[in-house]
Amino acid sequence: EKDVEAECSFRVSGKQPQLWNPVTGETRYLTSFTDNGTVTTLKLLFDTTQSYFIVFAGKTDHRTGEPNFSDKADLMTLGGSWNVSFNPLWGGPDSVEFKELSDWSLSEVEGIRYYSGTAVYNKLFDLSEPVNGRVYLNLGNVKNIAKVTLNGHDLGTVWSAPWEIEITDALTSGENKLRIEVANLWVNRLIGDEQLPDDGIVGEQWPQWLINGEKRPSSRYTFTTYKHYSA
C-alpha cells in the first residue's frame, strides 16, 4: 500500500482551490496549480483509501508554486514490547506484555482471542532531539477505533484510514508516554460465547434467569436476541 499522486483537472477557472480533509477537519489553500482559463489542474497526494473535498472560492491570491504536499520521512518506528491492559470483567487477562503488536483473534489466550471491548496500550519512548516540522503517528491497521493520548494530552480518535494523527504539540525531547485505547467489534465475544452452553432464547421463550434478574448459569459474557452469525 503506497501513496498515490494524481493530477486532477476541474472545470473551473479564476478561483482559489482549497483542500478540505473530511477526517481531520483540516482546511488549507492549495498553492500549486495551473489555470488555462477553462480548467484548473493540480496535483493531489492520497494515502490508501483517502479522500478530500476540493473547494474553489475567492481570488487566486495564494498561488505560490510551493508543493501542495510536504515530503514525508520516517522519524522512528515504535517497535518492541507494549504493555496492554484488558478488562477482566469482560474476560480479558488484565495487564499483559505484548512482545510485538498482533491480531487479538490469533492469540493463544482465549481471554484475548475472544475479547470484545477496549484495551489500553502503553509505551514509553525517547526522542533524542527536537524535530522540525509536523509529526504524525501512524497506527498501521487498526481494528476498529483508537483514542491516542501522548504525555497526558488527548489527541483525539482515529477511526479510518490512513490511521494517523498529529502529535507535534504533545511530543517532547526525552521520554514520552504514549497511551492508545483500542476498541474492537462485538463479534469476537459472540464467537467466544458460542463455545459455551447456550442459556439464551430458545424458540420464543426468554431465559428464566433473565426474567427473574438472576445470575446467568453459564459463563457467557453477552446476550443477544438474534443469532445473526454462524460460529
Q: Each predicted region: which residue ranges?
A:
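Extended, loop-rich substrate-binding clefts of extracytoplasmic carbohydrate-active enzymes
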Residues: 121
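A generic beta-sheet turn/junction motif
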Residues: 1, 12, 141-143, 171-173
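An acidic-aromatic loop/edge-strand motif
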Residues: 62-117, 173-231
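Aromatic-lined ligand-binding clefts that engage carbohydrates, nucleic acids, or primary amines
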Residues: 9, 125-151, 158-159, 178-182
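Aromatic-rich membrane-interfacial microdomains
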Residues: 155-165
